Amino acid sequence: HYVMLDNIVGLGNCKYKYLINSAQLAWLKKDLALVDKSTPLIVSMHVPAYTYTGISDGKPMTKKRNTQYQDVQVLINILKPFKEAHILTGHDHRNRNIQITHNILEHNFASASAISWKLNDVRIMTTDGTLSGYQIFDISGKQIQWHYKAVGLTPEKSQFRAYDLNTVPEKYGGNPASNEILVNVFNWDPRWKISVTEDGQELPVEQLWEKDPLYMYIRDKTQRFNNRPKDWRAVNCIHMFHTKATEANSEIVVSVTDRFG
């Protein structure tokens, strides 16, 4: 069952606020009253319902978007009785998957146009380092699967980027002679598995709230932002993973596995 909501309220002069108004929520409640609770739901709207705020005690922290706090909670309460519900959102031009409840997952999508409406050789990724691309949903009956695909790449080559922090300049997050490894897993959600081995031995992996080194480098080098110095800065993201090898020249294998295996 598919639903489209409008949670942008125009205020004039290119200003707006985030709001799912009461009329839409009342309509949605009536609409879903006619839908079997075992039917998967896909609810789309522009602005995310939730966002990540960091990591505390090794666990990702989330919050509702401030200006639509109350109406988001009403929306969640309406969706809770269903076996499976997906909220599809955009707006921020970055990738986030947030497990709101055991049965409600928000997918906040990166953009095929990366960080702006123009796609060119310097705008190939978003502010969290996700390659410009789009989400593909495969739906068969009541079964839903999804994966991320970068523009111009196969799905297999669209999932992560790994950094040898020995070789990354310090101003972009590098750490010379540390043997540290940073992995950006673009479409991560809490049911993914991240594995890094050194010469066949598993290394401990830690989730970080961190910026993407390559995006910081690209933004620093391009001249296209000189007249807008605060726009599209690198942001901390939840899908960064860190480990440390024992040697600089050992064989490192990074493997990421989504919830579908």
What positions do the PLM features span?
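A cross-domain feature marking catalytic cores of carbohydrate-active enzymes
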Residues: 7, 45-47, 148
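His/acidic metal-ligating clusters that form di-metal
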Residues: 3, 12-106, 179
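Conserved beta-sheet core of the metallophosphoesterase superfamily
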Residues: 60-168, 202-204, 221-223
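Long, low-complexity serine/threonine/glycine- and acidic-rich segments characteristic of extracellular
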Residues: 160-261
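Hydrophobic residues embedded in beta-strands of well-ordered beta-sheets
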Residues: 1, 143-144, 252
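Short acidic, gly/pro-rich beta-turn/loop elements at beta-sheet edges
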Residues: 13-15, 53, 116, 147, ...
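Active-site/binding-pocket entry motifs
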Residues: 9-11, 112-113
